[in-house]
Amino acid sequence: MSLDVKGLSLSIGSSRILSDVSLNVKDGERVGLVGSSGSGKSMLLRAAIGLVPSNCKITGSCHVGNAQIVGANDSALARIRGKYVGVVFQQADRALNPIMSVSEQIALPLRLHYNLDENDIQNRVKVMLEKVGLGANILNKRTFELSGGQMQRVGIATALITCPKLILADEPTTALDSVTQKDVVNMLTSLVDDMGASMLFVTHDFSVLSRAATRCYVLDSGRLVDSARVGELLENPKVRSTKQLVLAARALSLSKNDLSLSSKNDLSLSSKNDLSHSNKNNSSKDDCIFKAKNIHVVLGSSKTRVEALKGVDFNLRVGESLALIGGSGSGKTTLIRSLLGLQEISEGRIEYCGKVVETAKNAKKSSLKDSAYVNMRKQCSLVFQHPFAALDPRWTVRKSVSEPLEIWRKNMSSDSNTVDSHVIDSKVDDVLNLVGLNPNVFGKRYPCELSGGQAQCVAIARALINNPRVLVADEPMSAIDVAERTRILDAFNVIRANRPNMACVFVSHDLGMIQHLASSVVVLKDGVVVESGNVSQILTNPKHSYTRELIDAATL
């Protein structure tokens, strides 16, 4: 089924989101739509199926097959959505219903559009689960029991269960590790081709786009500025915004021939601030901030028992920049949550600055009154993986960013609350500017008014505002386009250069980012450390087959 958009313009109040956009996707064609965060990609995709805010003004035309979407009523749109058009949304954890089982979720479009008996529905669900690489053992699970990769596969299965003729995929691999990204894209494109369907694939990642589409459009500030075959855009970009995206993608990709940044791009991220090479740790072996010994973590009940960590040893020294890498479900997030006292450990012990903050024996009793624990929580900041889940939807950006300072306000040196407020406002302005957000523009906004990349920038700003001794970032750039990543990497590296004693832990599946941020790396697989060492040595000469698999999947 074809998609034909002509002269589409969309505005909300005085803000113009899309301006005179025209594009087409032919029958059986896979087309990409690429652009930086906030360029209007997701809004264009939503406009293609009538999922736009009620207060928006939209002009132009959008045809799905012979059906006109612009101006169509709700009943007409309901007949098209889910049956003829399937949508894979950006964040599966937000798109899926948390109170529905996987089976109920995938079966819902069938129940809405077809009159089938229950056995037929369940058989189709099982067949679709098998096609997306999932087993029948997850049929009765809820979304919160699934990994990110599993949730995204369930989202794809839900979108494809009715065999629609047009697939709209909005950043379907965001926040997935490189191996899972490759598998999901290959699986999605294979299913689309087998069904003879068309697909519009929205992304900011050229390494993903090269696998998902044959040609693409480039969107910049709500306008289409370029279009060509994907290979042509990668090899010879002509438009400025396309060049920036391609250069940024190459700068942050892995190269088997040359892992140094300076020879790969001319962007602002320079080798003098590339702390993966400059921050060699001169601390003594005993100068550790965190020491974790023989950490075991068991999740779930007796029936669903999962050993998330299996005897992990972990040291973090003063000034060290360390990366934890691994696929979805490898235990990366569980490890950092254990370090920060957010996850009970089943065995082992954790020390912070030489003092025990958690053991298996005291894990179940409150440590809030323990001075060592309180000291650790004051001096450590965490950037969560999902910014929308971490930000209070009722709070403005300014209030969210200032929250850590408000909590520890009594430690700030000032003579009055008025001075305190001025100091806090000044610090909020500083960190928002640091992550590339104008405080005058974004300070009064709410999370629902932010793009995915902008929300992640707010989360990073909030983590930095307290000048932490330890910064722990859990997939800090999973929702940010490649152009923004270079600016954020610059910000991280400038901060590290000015505060050489601050230790950082970067949890990521993005090996291109890790090579510029970390001096050492730990590779986790199924809760076990399979390889560790100097980041350049690991990336250029990996010993373990799993490490090689991660690197191969991340190479552009």
Which sequence ranges carry the predicted segments?
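Conserved ABC transporter NBD signature motif
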Residues: K57-I69, G348-N362, M376
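A short, surface-exposed alpha-helical micro-motif characterized by mixed small hydrophobic
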Residues: L209-R211, I514-H516
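Helix-to-loop junction immediately C-terminal to a conserved catalytic motif
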Residues: I49, L340
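ABC ATPase NBD coupling module
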Residues: I69-G86, E104, L112, L233-P237, ...
